[in-house]
Amino acid sequence: MANEAYPCPCDIGHRLEYGGLGREVQVEHIKAYVTKSPVDAGKAVIVIQDIFGWQLPNTRYMADMISGNGYTTIVPDFFVGQEPWDPSGDWSIFPEWLKTRNAQKIDREISAILKYLKQQCHAQKIGIVGFCWGGIAVHHLMMKYSEFRAGVSVYGIVKDSEDIYNLKNPTLFIFAENDVVIPLKDVSLLTQKLKEHCKVEYQIKTFSGQTHGFVHRKREDCSPADKPYIDEARRNLIEWLNKYM
């Protein structure tokens, strides 16, 4: 994502060469990537893409990682057939491109996916995880849908509004200390609002020395210095889901 006040490139980082363990399906008007859990525990997680789209191998890798921990996962195409952002594209037109892909206007898609998970996957407990653009979506959805048992927003831009604290269920926020997209003052604002007003469990973690995209767009072996932070963030994500689902 780019900061809305100061659009800047969102580095695609390391694009994984990853085939995936799941399959593509059609859910009403949406294409989606689904991975069934090896253990049918009646739990599912919606994984929400970043600006590079639902087919980015890195996002599917994360969905498969979550699935391996006991959850059926689904990565829907929340752009609904519109092209994802091309990392080699002209960043001067990014703000206009983004206007047609509003992370807070995906209710029709969420309704279809929830129906699919309940009817076709027999999910009784559902959570959500989102990266970048998807992190914004998670924050929005956790303030709107009480049926999401747990949410994890990974470096989603903090939108300043009076109700950013109004979470309905436990939510984990993961940020990077050196994120040029999300200034630490925005993280401090969110921290303050939640501390003053939030009535459910939440946690905000900011990872030292890390940059935007570190959780899902860096290979685990890319740097000995980064690997512990990547591992910890991914572990925290799974632990949060396990605790509240």
From Swiss-Prot:
The keyword Iron does not apply. The active site is at C132, D179, H212. InterPro entries: AB_hydrolase_fold, CMBL, Dienelactn_hydro. Cysteine hydrolase. GO terms for cellular component: cytosol. Its main location: cytoplasm. It is found in: Cytoplasm, Cytosol. It is an enzyme of class 3 (hydrolase). It holds the Pfam family DLH. Its EC number is 3.1.-.-. The modification N-acetylalanine is found at A2. The modification Phosphoserine is found at S223. This is Carboxymethylenebutenolidase homolog. Belongs to the dienelactone hydrolase family. The keyword Kinase does not apply. Keywords: Acetylation, Cytoplasm, Hydrolase, Phosphoprotein. One of its GO terms (molecular function) is hydrolase activity. It comes from Pongo abelii. Coiled coil: none annotated. Gene3D superfamilies: alpha/beta hydrolase (3.40.50.1820). The modification N6-acetyllysine is found at K36.
